[in-house]
Amino acid sequence: MTIFEALRHDHDTQRELIDKLIETSGDTKTRHALLEKLKHELQEHAKFEERYFYDPLIFKDLTQEKARHSIAEHHDIDELIEELESTDMSSPAWLATAKKLHHKVHHHLDEEEQEVFQLAGRALSDKQKHDLAQKYDANMH
C-alpha cells in the first residue's frame, strides 16, 4: 500500500460521514454522534497526514506551496467544526455551517487527490510512498 492509497481510504470515510451529517435534522442523538465521529476522524487524519505526508513535502520545492495550502485548509476545517459545536443544532445556522463544512471537506479532499497526490508522486520515491503509508496507517488505525 502507498501513502496515497492509505489517505484515499480515510478520505472515503470522511466523505461518507460529512454526507450523512448534512442529511440529519434537529438536535438529535444521530446528529451529535455523527458530528463527534466526523470531528475525531478529521482531527486524527489531519494530525497524521501532516506528520507522515505533508512534513516530507513541505521541504521540497515542487510540493511546498500545495503542502502549506492543505495544512491551512485543515485549520479552516477545525474552525468550522468549532463553529458547529457552539451553534444550536436545531437552528438554521447550524445546517448552514454544516453545509459550508461539507463543501470545504469535499473541496479539500478532491484537491488533495487530484493535485497534491500527482505532485507528491513525483517528489517521493517508491520506498518513501510505502514507508510513509506504513507509518500513517500504524498511527491512524
Indicate residue ranges for each PLM-predicted region.
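Small-residue-biased structural context
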Residues: M1-H141
